[in-house]
Swiss-Prot record:
CDD domains, sorted: PIN_YqxD-like
Organism the protein comes from: Shigella flexneri
UniProt gene name: yaiI
Protein name as catalogued: UPF0178 protein YaiI
Family annotation (InterPro entries): UPF0178
Family: Belongs to the UPF0178 family.
């Protein structure tokens, strides 16, 4: 079991939560990015640098993730592909994507893309709040408890 991080867009504060969690859980954590990343020394944490380009990091995460893994991403199509492979997917605001919710999120994403393409300003997400960080940590812990229960 591995935690995969779409690291180019992942907020630093979320990475810090993940570093601590990887140590505590003794779980491999792989940060995939198209640039060099500084991570704390750990036998559980590593980086995987990929070539720059559209969806290169996403495609690498999809290629390597397996059923039971966790993918941290705000990218809806990446989350959908991870779920299709049997992995769990969580965004940096603590929202866990599920097979039931991912279709709705994909539809909304496509709708917003259409609005932007037609020149309508849709704005971006609010900045990450303390509540978001707490929700992320809580959902990560919930996932970890599910993993432990499934191991028996």
């Amino acid at each position: 079991m591995t935690i995969w991080v779409d690291a180019d867009a992942c907020p630093n504060v979320i990475k810090e939560i993940l570093y601590r969690a990887a140590e505590r859980m003794q779980m491999p954590l792989v940060l995939v990015a198209n640039q060099s990343l500084r991570v704390p020394p750990s036998r559980f944490i590593r980086t995987l640098r990929v070539a720059a380009g559209f969806d290169v990091a996403d495609n690498e995460i999809v290629r390597q993730c397996e059923a039971g893994d966790l993918v941290i991403t705000a990218d809806i199509p990446l989350a959908a592909e991870a779920i299709e492979k049997g992995a769990a997917a969580l965004n940096s605001r603590g929202e866990r994507y599920t097979p039931a919710t991912i279709r709705e999120r994909l539809t909304m994403r496509d709708f917003m893309d259409t609005l932007r393409a037609s020149g309508i300003q849709t704005g971006g997400p609010d900045s990450l709040s303390q509540r978001d960080r707490q929700a992320f940590a809580a959902e990560l812990e919930k996932w970890w408890l599910e993993v432990q229960r499934s191991r028996g």
